[in-house]
């Protein structure tokens, strides 16, 4: 197994891993969503009068629909379908009436799920953390032998395509160089086991299969992946034991030893 993966596993199993990780991924619930008071009053009115069409027409335009239902997304993307599918409209509205008006009003202003906020957190942590290498914008990065690039996912992707023949059409999370040697990487915070999280793992691993030239690859991963005897640990880490997969918490140590 890769040295840095071993260090990450030890850190996760013996140290205050989660307390330290919170500095990288501070998953603090967002503020409640704001909805215009006039819209709230209309929702109350149509809920009480059980005006299915008007109530649904308002709710479907909000960021967050009050209930989970497989047919809602279709209605969101096809406004005409509302008039042609009265049975589904009635069924969904009956489900909404069952949760009560008070619950409905709470549901539509719920904060964004923290797992939807995770994306930018790693880069924010990079910006505010001191590393052994200087942090440079994309222009200054080319002028120096050493540095960590501060740029958007798309800027990093385009840079990697131009300089390393990087082929995937998705953004990158990390680019650095030391004494002229380049590193590119993906980051993931795997919060649980399951299909989506497995896909996230594979998404990060794909950086090693990107076909990029003249650079080395890293996958900066955190979360349940380091739980020994866990599903991800057994089926993925063992299969990818030769890759540089490690926690964000050991990134600076890795960069210090990178040659």
Regions found by a protein language model. Name each.
Residues 13, 28-29, 188-232:
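Catalytic cores of nucleic-acid endonucleases
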Residues 115-123, 127:
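Internal, hydrophobic cores of structured domains that mediate oligomerization or house catalytic pockets
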Residues 108, 112, 128-166:
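A short acidic/basic microdomain associated with nuclease active sites
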Residues 219-259:
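Domain-level recognition of nuclease-like catalytic cores that cleave nucleotide substrates
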Residues 113, 117, 167-170, 195-206:
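Short, well-structured alpha-helical interface segments that form or flank functional binding sites
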Residues 1-118:
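Nuclease-adjacent, charged terminal/linker segments that flank catalytic cores
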Residues 167-184:
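Active-site beta-strand-loop-beta-strand hairpin of nuclease catalytic cores
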Residues 125-134, 178-181, 214:
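Secondary-structure boundary elements
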């Amino acid at each position: 197994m890769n040295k840095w993966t071993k260090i990450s596993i030890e850190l996760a199993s013996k140290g205050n891993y989660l307390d330290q990780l919170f500095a990288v991924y501070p998953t603090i619930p967002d503020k409640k969503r704001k909805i215009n008071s006039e819209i709230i009053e209309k929702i109350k009115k149509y809920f009480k009068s059980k005006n299915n069409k008007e109530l649904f027409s308002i709710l479907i335009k909000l960021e967050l629909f009050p209930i989970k239902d497989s047919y809602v997304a279709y209605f969101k993307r096809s406004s005409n379908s509302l008039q042609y599918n009265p049975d589904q409209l009635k069924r969904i509205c009956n489900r909404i009436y069952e949760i009560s008006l008070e619950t409905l009003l709470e549901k539509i202003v719920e904060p964004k799920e923290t797992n939807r906020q995770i994306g930018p957190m790693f880069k924010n942590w990079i910006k505010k953390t001191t590393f052994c290498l200087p942090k440079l914008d994309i222009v200054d990065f080319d002028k120096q032998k050493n540095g960590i690039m501060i740029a958007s996912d798309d800027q990093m992707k385009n840079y990697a395509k131009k300089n390393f023949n990087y082929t995937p059409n998705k953004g990158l999370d990390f680019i650095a160089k030391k004494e002229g040697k380049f590193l590119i990487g993906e980051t993931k915070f795997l919060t649980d086991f399951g299909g989506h999280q497995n896909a996230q793992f594979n998404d990060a691993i794909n950086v090693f299969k990107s076909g990029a030239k003249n650079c080395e690859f890293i996958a900066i991963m955190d979360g349940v992946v380091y739980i020994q005897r866990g599903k991800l640990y057994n089926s993925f880490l063992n299969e990818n034991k030769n890759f540089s997969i490690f926690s964000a918490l050991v990134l600076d140590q890795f960069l210090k030893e990178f040659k």
